[in-house]
């Protein structure tokens, strides 16, 4: 058992840490609410764009590159990580999944290109001497479409130029406050479901100019929207996991404070008992 001074010092430092983690928990909770609201507000836009694609692509046998599968000679991996830690296993889970999938496919560095969001992911691959084709650090906690536009444009350009034949996004999918799932989903080429699962409310309309020209405009916009919507979802997951991590840290700190307080009281009681014993012993010796 440590001295009273040591125990008291630990109690004070733990209380300060507890205050910090509680504050971070509250901040993460506020950011989570905003992230969920942003994601919900963006969904109607994607639904309308989905309907437009359904109406156009559903009435034509389009050979648009974004709708046609081709032999995969090189894959694109768009990895969404965070710019800072203290979010539990948020980064470790998704980065481990990327490496695992690459290894299971037996891919060499020449078989894929990495696009990485977040400093943690960028440093992760850099420390392993794995080349990153495009890096986007400092992603805002509440990203706007403009703030992530560089990476969406880069991903689409790589696909349209034939530098990659498939684009996959790796992210932590937000399920609820207590659960997130490391997820990989293919974005390009768009699946038949992506091109035909809308409501098709514009199917009775005539389109000007021709449908292929319209697809050339709205398909890239739709892919940009898919990427942006995924980033919004990943941000919600990040805030939720950080909120949970900080709550757990606060709970652990409270438990530690209780244990240290018990140790302090016992040590103080032992010291008092020792002093009384010494006084009694001294008095007895004087008799």
UniProtKB/Swiss-Prot annotation:
Annotated localization: Cell membrane
Is Membrane included in the keywords of this UniProt record? yes
Give the superkingdom in one word. Bacteria
Instruction: Note the Pfam families from the entry.
Output: ATP-synt
Write out the GO biological process terms: proton motive force-driven plasma membrane ATP synthesis
Of the GO CC terms on this record, one is: proton-transporting ATP synthase complex
Q: What does this protein do?
A: Produces ATP from ADP in the presence of a proton gradient across the membrane. The gamma chain is believed to be important in regulating ATPase activity and the flow of protons through the CF(0) complex.
Subunit structure and binding partners: F-type ATPases have 2 components, CF(1) - the catalytic core - and CF(0) - the membrane proton channel. CF(1) has five subunits: alpha(3), beta(3), gamma(1), delta(1), epsilon(1). CF(0) has three main subunits: a, b and c.
Question: Know the name of this protein?
Answer: ATP synthase gamma chain
Q: Which organism is it from?
A: Staphylococcus carnosus (strain TM300)
